[in-house]
């Protein structure tokens, strides 16, 4: 497991649903990986392969929406998506450096993430994305971000053409898929 203090939380996150070691290897080491695949059961062997590759590179690795498996496999942490509203897990079962991060789209979901004890809240979508016509825009993003004292990460629709607009939002960092898929961006 990578060691980092809460003050050294990652600022850049790449969501993956498949594993391409060559692609991940080309990313800057400061980019953390969130493995998110809701279509099939998680394959522990695959997750351990991703973990090993991330460890070799000094990269943080989070598993989406499976807290028990992330703890069992001694990962850096878990990502709780906005639809995960469970607050009945026992935080004392976590290792000292285990980090919970999660996403929200509204003030109500931000409050749930606060109750879950997340260290970072991913607010999304910042910009228009293919799967949804609703998006925050920088003004709405900043209004939502002001509703919490937890550090926020910008997520959704970030690409080369709107990347400079990230300067308009008050975020600790950003996360994405398409931005990191295009290797020319990094």
Regions picked out by a protein language model, each given a short descriptive name:
Residues 1-23:
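N-terminal amphipathic alpha-helix/helix-capping segment at the start of soluble metabolic enzymes
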Residues 3, 21, 27-93:
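N-terminal active-site wall of soluble small-molecule enzyme domains
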Residues 10-16, 31-35, 61-63, 78-80, ...:
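Hydrophobic faces of well-ordered beta-strands that scaffold small-molecule active sites
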Residues 14, 33, 70, 113, ...:
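Conserved, mostly hydrophobic/aromatic
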Residues 21-31, 110-123:
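Alpha/beta enzyme core
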Residues 27-30, 73, 116, 147, ...:
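Structural motif
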Residues 46-62, 85, 90-106, 134-157:
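Alpha-helix-loop-beta-strand connector modules within alpha/beta enzyme cores
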Residues 81-89, 120-135, 158-186:
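Glycine-rich phosphate-binding active-site loops on the catalytic face of alpha/beta enzymes
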């Amino acid at each position: 497991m990578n060691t980092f203090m809460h003050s050294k939380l990652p600022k850049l996150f790449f969501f993956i649903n498949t594993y391409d070691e060559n692609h991940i290897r080309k990313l800057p080491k400061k980019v953390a990986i969130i493995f998110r695949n809701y279509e099939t059961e998680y394959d522990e062997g695959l997750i351990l392969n991703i973990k090993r590759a991330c460890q070799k590179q000094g990269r943080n690795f989070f598993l989406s929406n499976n807290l028990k498996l992330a703890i069992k496999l001694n990962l850096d942490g878990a990502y709780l998506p906005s639809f995960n509203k469970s607050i009945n897990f026992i935080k004392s079962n976590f290792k000292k450096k285990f980090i919970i991060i999660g996403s929200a789209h509204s003030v109500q979901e931000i409050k749930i993430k606060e109750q879950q004890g997340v260290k970072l809240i991913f607010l999304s979508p910042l910009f228009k994305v293919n799967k949804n016509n609703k998006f925050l825009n920088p003004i709405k993003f900043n209004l939502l971000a002001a509703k919490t004292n937890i550090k926020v990460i910008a997520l959704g629709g970030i690409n080369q053409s709107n990347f400079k607009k990230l300067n308009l939002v008050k975020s600790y960092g950003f996360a994405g898929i398409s931005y990191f898929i295009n290797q020319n961006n990094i």
